[in-house]
Amino acid sequence: VEGLYISPEQAGAQNQKQIKAFDPAEYHAICEAAEGHLRRWSVAPELPGADEFARFARDNRITLSIAHSDADFDTVCRAFEIGYRHITHLYSGCSSVVRKNGFRIAGVVEAAYYLDDMDVEIIADGCHLPLSLLKLITKLKKPEHIALITDSIRPTGLDVRESFSGSSDDPIPIVVEDGVAKLLNRQAFAGSIATSDRLIRT
């Protein structure tokens, strides 16, 4: 599961209407409905209730992953200590260095490099991350802590230019061009259309 408990500031192509605060009754119900098949959950650890969620995930053998997060460096390091050991699609929907009142604040990306045992995913489709960042990631992270992912969505493998992301009940229109899926305003990617072999070739 990716969401529902993510940062609106790092939502990317996620449906803003489906972003929620941690709700124990809700995530207990989701886990129960999954009947033991829920193996990983990607959330933003800076949100209130993330610690309680971490305990719940551990009790239910669910791998915790950081995704669509605006957390600062210290928050990620603390999250790592309580069980958040994975980062979903590094650089995509992740905070990085920002300036606040003149001071630089490190984020998820910097913590990913600092924490040797933090696993990271990379969308190596040739679009989401330039070759320079792929080189940096593979130089600073050990191979056993890097996972290639497609992050592919609906139009993958189809000869279409227009499609949608999310539920058909509340679709987010997307356009396919330049080898990637984009939001209609072209200000952000909506997902990948890559297959696994493309990641290896990149």
PLM region descriptions:
Residues E2-I105, G157:
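Histidine/acidic-residue-rich, glycine-tolerant segments that coordinate divalent metal ions
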Residues S42-A50, Y113-Y114, S132-L134, S196-R198:
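A general structural signal for short secondary-structure boundary/capping elements
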Residues R104-I122, G126, T138-T202:
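His/Asp/Glu-enriched, well-ordered alpha-helical/loop segment
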